[in-house]
């Protein structure tokens, strides 16, 4: 359940609107004035709340819920208890997300920590920077010369926007984030502590010492990208580091110089992608995946968590392990190792 200290609901919202947002049908004869005021999990939802259910593991909780209404897939509709209104939709979780965004708009992206509007007198905006109407700038923000900030963008306390950096419209930059040498599209969310556009890790190694290679590329982030807290994206060495439209990046991810990430990829926490690697569209990297440099991961490929990628991955492949390989091969290897280990333990026990 949401804590009103942190997230205030804009409810009530009529169930008719909930159904429209979620792509659900209202039951026939339902009172058109019925509404919800909040949203909560099945087990804690009350008579003013909306819940959702799309996993058989929660069938028992569904049967006991006290929610006013519940978004469910057709297979679970008959299990909704009396007193709770079943809103049947093919995608309950996606529908629930849309309703949450309507109920709690301030939770959808970083906002001003002070509920402020306009430019705070405690910020520093260089006279040569250009801000479109509706930009919110919190105390402690620094905006360098030549930077451009699009309309309705929010820069939270302590954010640093470097010289010449361009940020599109409807974006949000969280507390303490820095954005340098970068071109940012529209509706991009950058969470607190993220670092974008700093030096890539480039050195000409040699016995006489490691000579730093100047990094003169940029970071380009396309529309509707989300970047998690404390994620780092290095600028390119001599070409650009690029994050494609709609890609979602979790917290604590490292993306090295010259990496190109396609559209609508998903990159989970603690992934490290080495320099000059390319991810095509719709790639998914599970948590703690490591990717060697100068590789290509094909469109739609999925990599299991904690895997290490040391060669190109074909489009649509599902790989896992260290070094990573097709999951069926990986599973066979693990099963074989388990059997060998069991035989060895049996032999040792027999010898004793």
Curated annotation (Swiss-Prot):
InterPro entries, A to Z: Hexapep, Hexapep_transf_CS, LpxD, Trimer_LpxA-like_sf, UDP_GlcNAc_AcTrfase_non-rep
Q: Which Gene3D superfamilies does the UniProt entry name for this protein?
A: Hexapeptide repeat proteins, MurE/MurF, N-terminal domain
Family indicated by similarity: Belongs to the transferase hexapeptide repeat family. LpxD subfamily.
Record's keyword terms, sorted: Acyltransferase, Lipid A biosynthesis, Lipid biosynthesis, Lipid metabolism, Repeat, Transferase
Active-site annotation = 257
- What's its top-level EC category? transferase
> Per UniProt, what is one GO molecular function of this protein?
N-acyltransferase activity
EC numbers for this chain: 2.3.1.191
Q: One cellular component GO annotation, for this chain's record?
A: membrane
- Offer one Pfam family short name for this entry: Hexapep
Metabolic or biological pathway, per its Swiss-Prot or TrEMBL entry = Bacterial outer membrane biogenesis; LPS lipid A biosynthesis
As for what it does, the entry says: Catalyzes the N-acylation of UDP-3-O-acylglucosamine using 3-hydroxyacyl-ACP as the acyl donor. Is involved in the biosynthesis of lipid A, a phosphorylated glycolipid that anchors the lipopolysaccharide to the outer membrane of the cell.
Keyword Lipid metabolism (UniProt) = yes
One Gene Ontology biological process:
lipid A biosynthetic process
Q: How does it assemble?
A: Homotrimer.
Q: Which PROSITE patterns match?
A: HEXAPEP_TRANSFERASES
Q: What name does this protein carry?
A: UDP-3-O-acylglucosamine N-acyltransferase
- Listed PANTHER family: UDP-3-O-ACYLGLUCOSAMINE N-ACYLTRANSFERASE, UDP-3-O-ACYLGLUCOSAMINE N-ACYLTRANSFERASE 1, MITOCHONDRIAL-RELATED
Q: Which reaction does it catalyse?
A: a UDP-3-O-[(3R)-3-hydroxyacyl]-alpha-D-glucosamine + a (3R)-hydroxyacyl-[ACP] = a UDP-2-N,3-O-bis[(3R)-3-hydroxyacyl]-alpha-D-glucosamine + holo-[ACP] + H(+)
Q: Record keywords: NAD included?
A: no
């Amino acid at each position: 359940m949401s804590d009103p200290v942190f997230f205030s609901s804009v409810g009530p919202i009529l169930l008719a609107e909930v159904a429209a947002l979620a792509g659900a049908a209202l039951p026939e004869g339902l009172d058109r004035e019925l509404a919800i005021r909040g949203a909560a999990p099945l087990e804690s939802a009350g008579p003013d709340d909306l819940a959702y259910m799309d996993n058989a593991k929660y069938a028992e909780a569904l049967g006991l819920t006290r929610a006013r209404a519940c978004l469910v897939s057709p297979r679970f509709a008959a299990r909704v208890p009396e007193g709770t209104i079943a809103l049947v939709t093919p995608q309950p979780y996606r529908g629930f997300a849309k309703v949450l965004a309507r109920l709690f708009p301030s939770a959808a992206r970083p906002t001003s920590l002070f509920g402020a509007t306009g430019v705070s007198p405690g910020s520093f905006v260089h006279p040569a920077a250009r801000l479109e109407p509706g930009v919110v700038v919190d105390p402690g923000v620094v905006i360098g010369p030549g930077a451009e900030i699009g309309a309705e963008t929010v820069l939270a306390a302590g954010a640093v926007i470097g010289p010449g950096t361009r940020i599109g419209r409807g974006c949000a930059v969280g507390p303490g984030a820095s954005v340098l040498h970068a071109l940012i599209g529209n509706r991009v969310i950058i969470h607190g502590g993220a670092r974008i556009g700093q030096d890539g890790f480039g050195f000409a190694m040699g016995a006489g010492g490691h000579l730093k290679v100047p990094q003169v590329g940029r970071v380009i982030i396309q529309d509707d990208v989300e970047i998690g807290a404390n994620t780092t994206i290095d600028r390119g060495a001599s070409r650009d580091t690029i994050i494609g439209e709609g890609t979602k990046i979790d917290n604590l991810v490292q993306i090295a110089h010259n990496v190109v990430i396609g559209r609508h990829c998903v990159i989970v926490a603690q992934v490290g992608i080495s320099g000059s690697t390319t991810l095509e569209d719709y790639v998914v990297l599970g948590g703690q995946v490591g990717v060697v440099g100068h590789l290509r991961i094909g469109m739609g490929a999925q990599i299991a968590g904690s895997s290490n990628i040391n060669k190109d991955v074909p489009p649509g492949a599902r790989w896992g392990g260290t070094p990573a390989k097709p999951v069926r091969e990986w599973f066979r290897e693990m099963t074989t190792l388990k059997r060998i280990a069991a035989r060895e333990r049996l032999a040792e026990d027999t010898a004793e």
